[in-house]
Amino acid sequence: MREHKNFWDRNAGLYDCFMRKDRAVYEKMYELIRPVVKDKTVLEVATGTGLIAKHIVKAAAHIEATDASPEMIAEAKRGNYSAKLRFSVQDMFSLPYASKSFDVVIVSNALHIVPQPEKSLRESKRVLKDDGVLIAPTFTHAENSFPGKIKAFFMNLAGFPLHSKWTSEEYLKFLQQNDWTVRKSVVLKASFPLTYTECENREC
């Protein structure tokens, strides 16, 4: 896990530049997220530099945006942002929040890069209200185009921590196997296929 955090600490200053090419796709994703978080209390884990949180915060009541990388959070705190948004360094596997604290939990582009994604899902479920919504967009690398495969190859050489290479169908099945009901899914065409999902707690 320390190596994982080191990768993001080293690349925090480059992250926004890297993501810029997918700006149009991310705008579509923000449009999908805003109605879900409207007037809601939101937790985002693996916020990175806060791209998603900053673009949806006007719709939300409040957002706690967290990341394991101190350097990513330092980047996120640069510039002006809404008073409804708070950034902090937290462990997505052991969050400090009380159970059933949030209306919405966002885990964006993180489940494929951690060694135990099911553990993160359990912790997300713990802090989510019974009638809450999990938003979990994830790059599904098994469906990469040829240029995407080349890009992923060089990212791997640079130390990018890819642990799960799902197809969109495999990813949805993974969520269902971890007791989530997928109420909405859309595959967006970014540098890599991005499977956007909204889920509800099947156990409730």
Name each region found by the language model:
Residues 163-178:
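Short alpha-helix
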Residues 43-94:
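Class I SAM-dependent methyltransferase SAM/SAH-binding core
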Residues 178-180, 184-204:
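Core SAM-dependent methyltransferase catalytic element
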Residues 1-37, 51, 55, 75, 135-158, ...:
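Conserved class I S-adenosyl-L-methionine
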Residues 118-130:
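A short glycine-rich, Lys/Arg-flanked "PGG" loop and its adjoining helix->strand segment in the class I
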Residues 104-116:
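A short SAM/SAH-binding and catalytic strip from SAM-dependent methyltransferases
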Residues 93-104:
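A short acidic, Gly/Pro-enriched loop at the edge of an enzyme's catalytic core
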